[in-house]
């Protein structure tokens, strides 16, 4: 299972969902759990999403 702390550690620069998945859990091909976690973190203000580039980053 992917944790918020791990996601924040990987977001040293803006990254797309697939790039995050490959750094966090390359054996899992589905990004559903990661996307759900990212949306919860965005709602809490812990990460932000740039719609123009399609990348996630720290606020």
Regions found by a protein language model. Give the residues of each.
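Short, hydrophobic-biased segments on the C-terminal half of alpha helices
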Residues: 35-39
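Short capping segments at the starts of secondary-structure elements
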Residues: 10-19
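Short helix-coil junctions and helix-kink-helix linkers
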Residues: 21-31
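Glycine-centered, phosphate/nucleic-acid-interacting loop/turn motifs that mediate DNA/RNA or nucleotide
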Residues: 45
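Residue-level detection of beta-strand scaffold positions
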Residues: 8-10, 55
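Short, leucine-enriched amphipathic alpha-helices that occur as contiguous helical runs
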Residues: 1-8, 31
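Short, cationic-aromatic polyanion-contact patches
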Residues: 49-59
